[in-house]
Amino acid sequence: FVGERTGQIIALYDSDKNGEADYKKVIAKDLQLSSGISIFNGDLYFSEVSKIWKIQNIESWLNDNISNSDLPKKVLVTDELPSDTWHGWKWLKHDEQGELYFNVGAPCNICLSENSQYASILRINDAGWHHVAKGVRNSVGFDFHPVTKKLFFTDNGRDWMGDDTPSCELNRVDINGQFFGYPYKHATNVKDP
């Protein structure tokens, strides 16, 4: 499954299991900044700038509908995310318990926002959303360590302080809600002017 800049989610279907896609099928369209994709218990989750959706039993649906132009039913997971497109791409990942993790980038290069969702990595479950990491300018990827299960994530450094300053980061979350410095400090010890 692939999120395209054209606002579509595409299923690449390998019917003969040779590692190459035999068919390409649009399964969602007219999305804004379609990006993050995660599969859990057979359901496909995907994001756009202010929403997260799921399609239930995606593999079964594809097997029954690969040759027609129908679109599967999308189920809204949340539409309570900021709509700013600056750092608006959302990346998704489920943990082993099925809780969905996603990023919300800062809506600017350097700023403070009253909306606590910005500049963070969040987790959503039946009880709502919760902070996993704060002070994260813009993560473009994260995953869980296979043994420790700790979350590791990237964070893109701020702009306009120099060619290579501050560095982008690879961080580890040790406690929920941990603060990683943005907008005050970058790359461990670079203070914001």
What residue spans do the PLM features occupy?
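A detector of repeated loop/turn-to-beta-strand junctions in beta-rich toroidal repeat architectures
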Residues: 6, 21, 49, 115-118, ...
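Short loop/turn segments immediately following beta-strands, especially the blade-tip
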Residues: 12-19, 55-68, 174-180
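Asp-box/WD-like beta-propeller blade repeats and closely related beta-sheet repeat scaffolds
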Residues: 23-24, 33, 38-40, 50-95, ...
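Residue position within the beta-strands of beta-propeller blades
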Residues: 1-3, 46-47, 101-104, 150-155
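A short loop-to-beta-strand structural motif that recurs across blades of beta-propeller domains
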Residues: 8-11, 43, 51-53, 120-122, ...
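Blade-loop segments of beta-propeller domains
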Residues: 5, 10-42
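Beta-propeller domain segments
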Residues: 89, 106-110, 116-119, 123-130, ...
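Residue-level detector of Asp-centered blade-edge/turn motifs that repeat once per structural unit
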Residues: 39-42, 94-97, 144-148
